[in-house]
């Protein structure tokens, strides 16, 4: 039999394989997180008719004579280039801008994917709803009253506790960073109510006790009649006078003294106020609560009460307490941190999504569901947080589309078709030659 017959057969078989890969790419053009394949060919071993000879004094050298025996598939590569993002506006839809993979777990087995169409199941786990695999990361833990995420610990299932309660927290500090208008008029003795109102800076702030009950702090500040740059302040709690103090400023509008005691530059001026809160039962007087009024830093303009010839402000006043609330929603930032949003306005870090990378992502094996698994040639998985070692950032509200270029695939399809036709022609022509040989006998 002629070698060209078998060369043509190998060409047909392997061009069919290439067509299978092209067809799979086109079929998955709209598959979220899909990575296209590419077929590379190589020639097979060649049969030597004669070897090479070296040159002599009388005659030059000759090259080897070899006849090829066809071709085969050298590799079928998975191309892990970045796909374009499609906006969905859904918080749990995620895409990776970089080289990282999301980590999924089923039982004890880990899978890796770029398809980030996730959701929260009835057990409040963050999962891939197509197969129920759970997304891996790190949950936040309570440490001295703060939520801390330890990314050095082992990865675990991520839980988003929609509907969970956040208990009330009593107010410990009220921080002021507002401005007192230096142009406010002095309030003379015997002034009428209108003049008193024009010359008084008043601000109200809600304070919380450990039950979530609200008390109203009212601060009234007026210019001192006798001393420039000095202001007299009165604190009222729930409409009842609580305490008094004075604030002094330097000639550049920065806070300088409290109750006549000048501070050094950088000193924090603060004053405690104490009042009774409601008890556990209706009408019962509870324990005393102390709240620290942080009035500012001596010599600072950014985190202190100031005195400038500009409108008095009331917005830059912050207190650290809150009432009871329920988790209503969540969002995921570009660092992969899941942030719970509560009905009382509090935001809590719930956990962080982990990403995986490999020395050779092309060595990963496809396992279905747009997932990959580790192989001996992918290298061991390296798990980390976003922004490290090329893992990239996480985008919320988007999905990564397939990296299939239809123009490229249609071109490959045409080239593959012509290659298949050419190899088929090799077989038919070889058959015609064999027929001629058979006819020689007749």
Curated annotation (Swiss-Prot):
InterPro entries: Falgellar_hook_FlgE_sf, Flag_bb_rod_N, Flagellar_basal_body_rod_CS, Flagellar_FlgE/F/G, Flg_bb/hook_C_dom, FlgE/F/G-like, FlgE_D2, LlgE_F_G-like_D1. GO terms for biological process: bacterial-type flagellum-dependent swarming motility. Transmembrane segments: none annotated. Keywords: Bacterial flagellum. Pfam families: Flg_bb_rod (PF00460), Flg_bbr_C (PF06429), FlgE_D2 (PF07559), LlgE_F_G_D1 (PF22692). It is found in: Bacterial flagellum basal body. One of its GO terms (cellular component) is bacterial-type flagellum basal body. Gene3D superfamilies: Flagellar hook protein FlgE. It comes from the Bacteria. Belongs to the flagella basal body rod proteins family. NCBIfam families: FlgEFG_subfam, PRK05682.1-5. This is Flagellar hook protein FlgE. The gene is flgE.
